[in-house]
Amino acid sequence: MRILGIDPGSRKCGYAIISHASNKLSLITAGFINITTTRLQEQILDLIEALDCLLDRYEVNEVAIEDIFFGYNPKSVIKLAQFRGALSLKILERIGNFSEYTPLQVKKALTGNGKAAKEQVAFMVKRLLNITSEIKPLDISDAIAVAITHAQRLKLH
């Protein structure tokens, strides 16, 4: 089974595809979609086109998205919600369903502490997947963490 994890952002959208087979997790690919255009409509189109390319290239069975954290300023939250809505619609069209996890759920699933720092989450991602190189930016390790959280949830059900 292949799981796509997404950490939506207003400038960078982290993504990761992991394989979950025989209780073993492995990283297939990870990166980020760099949102460089200035008009919102173009940003949404760029994001959706990049997601389409990922879904075309990899046979994804499940998708998990990190929920929006409301600590940002209201304008950023609204923009992020628009990106998330566009992502959600595309995923529903292509895959049919997706799961959502709060940052607290992801941190707790990986570190046992819902208030863990992003660096602690990145450390656990590397440890769980036997990754020796640095994962930068943290949007990528967050996306991997979302995918791992979903894999753990699937294992429990």
Swiss-Prot record:
Coiled coil: none annotated. CDD domains: RuvC (cd16962). One of its GO terms (molecular function) is crossover junction DNA endonuclease activity. It is found in: Cytoplasm. Its cofactor is Mg(2+). SUPFAM superfamilies: Ribonuclease H-like. Mg(2+) 1 binds at residues 7, 139. The active site is at residues 7, 66, 139. InterPro entries: RNaseH-like_sf (IPR012337), RNaseH_sf (IPR036397), X-over_junc_endoDNase_Mg_BS (IPR020563), X-over_junc_endoDNase_RuvC (IPR002176). Binds 2 Mg(2+) ion per subunit. It is an enzyme of class 3 (hydrolase). GO terms for biological process: DNA recombination; DNA repair. Keywords: Cytoplasm, DNA damage, DNA recombination, DNA repair, DNA-binding, Endonuclease, Hydrolase, Magnesium, Metal-binding, Nuclease. The keyword Membrane does not apply. Its EC number is 3.1.21.10. One of its GO terms (cellular component) is Holliday junction resolvase complex. It catalyses: Endonucleolytic cleavage at a junction such as a reciprocal single-stranded crossover between two homologous DNA duplexes (Holliday junction). HAMAP family: RuvC (MF_00034). Belongs to the RuvC family. Homodimer which binds Holliday junction (HJ) DNA. The HJ becomes 2-fold symmetrical on binding to RuvC with unstacked arms; it has a different conformation from HJ DNA in complex with RuvA. In the full resolvosome a probable DNA-RuvA(4)-RuvB(12)-RuvC(2) complex forms which resolves the HJ. PANTHER family: CROSSOVER JUNCTION ENDODEOXYRIBONUCLEASE RUVC (PTHR30194:SF3). The RuvA-RuvB-RuvC complex processes Holliday junction (HJ) DNA during genetic recombination and DNA repair. Endonuclease that resolves HJ intermediates. Cleaves cruciform DNA by making single-stranded nicks across the HJ at symmetrical positions within the homologous arms, yielding a 5'-phosphate and a 3'-hydroxyl group; requires a central core of homology in the junction. The consensus cleavage sequence is 5'-(A/T)TT(C/G)-3'. Cleavage occurs on the 3'-side of the TT dinucleotide at the point of strand exchange. This is Crossover junction endodeoxyribonuclease RuvC. It comes from Helicobacter pylori (strain ATCC 700392 / 26695) (Campylobacter pylori). The lineage of its organism: Bacteria, Pseudomonadati, Campylobacterota, Epsilonproteobacteria, Campylobacterales. The gene is ruvC.
